[in-house]
Amino acid sequence: MKKAALHNLGCKVNAYETEAMQHLLEEAGYEIVPFTQKADVYVINTCSVTNMADRKSRQMLHKAKKNNPDSIVVAAGCYVQTSEKEVLNDLSVDIVIGNDRKHDLVRLLEEYSLDSVNDTVDDINDGKHDFEELFIDQTKEHTRAFIKVQDGCNQFCSYCIIPYARGRVRSRRFENVIAEVERLAANGFKEVVLTGIHLSSYGVDFEEATGLLELIQAVNAVKGIERIRLGSLEPKIVTEHFASELSKLDKICPHFHLSLQSGCDATLKRMNRKYTIKEYERGCELLRKYFVHPAITTDVIVGFPGETEEEFEQTKAYLEHIHFYEMHIFKYSKRKGTRAAVMPDQIDEQIKAVRSEKLIALGHDMSKEFRKFYIGKNEEVLFEEKAVIGDKEYFVGYTKEYVKVAKKTDENLENQIVSGRISGMLTDEILLFE
């Protein structure tokens, strides 16, 4: 039996695609082994979101060939799409697969075995591509499954290469999403996370008036699924109608990641983000109107070109005002091929580091405050796995708001939803469950 190893770099969409490619290989009779072991085939699903991601992708391709010089090394994904010539000239790489050919993995391996011909990468931006159907019915996790429902992005933020790597918006057919959710439910999964490159755009490429809300409502009707989470959302999707209709669904998790990037309108304009801080705040207000204490999380970029001290302080004050559950703080890094990379007034790395530290500290304080709200309250927790915290063993899981909880027990609670009382804080990041 031939052996194959896969390695994923990047986002949750990439992770889904890697699991789908593993499924294809298993169906074709391959034995899946850890990436560190010797294999006949190595598949690296690459990332290109930053220059560092490009470098890591190259490193993993070279590592694969070093593991077994006689192996077939497959480079797939975003780095392949943005750096085609570089990848085709890389002697470590045998097969290249862009972001619309992953379903062809097994066929391309068979063809390569016959004539050793490398493949070319299609232009993902020519507007001629449909959603690439990939399927999973199992994941590495045993309780939560990520489902890719959308690909591509039409936004073209000035710092981002992803529209060039992923192409225009393409949505997965409604019936195919539901069929996959039903398969996962039949295999015991209780929670699904709907994800995409630009999830809020789901359905804009359909002739019929079907959008993300209608998809969520349909998933909510699937028997066996008890929780639905959403990937990153654009602020403008949160209208009164959207928030009101979501709140009527019994399975929706009140955990919303609204991408912000900056709390300053001038910075947002340079980023080519298509909303104002006032519009963003309105989205948060609506979520808090229709959900009790929802978890609102976000991303923030510090040190974007031209960000003055005054603009940074405005962002910091805005973050405190919105009061997020969690914030992912990124120091701006140049990405070749984007408009921001050639903008004037690039910020010194030391200044970026100081600003980042300030926001990370702020985020830590806000997260701790958010978690404290639950002390003394009864919550439902989906337990996932055992973990050693301090020197004691606990079962850990998450509330609907994605707050991590630990319970001291000898029972096997894996994939069980249990009701109980939050008695206190075990650590700054984990609540204690009775």
Where are these regions (language model features)?
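Conserved strand-turn element in the central/C-terminal portion of the radical SAM core barrel
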Residues: 156, 160-167, 227-236, 262-272, ...
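Terminal RNA-binding accessory module
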Residues: 342-434
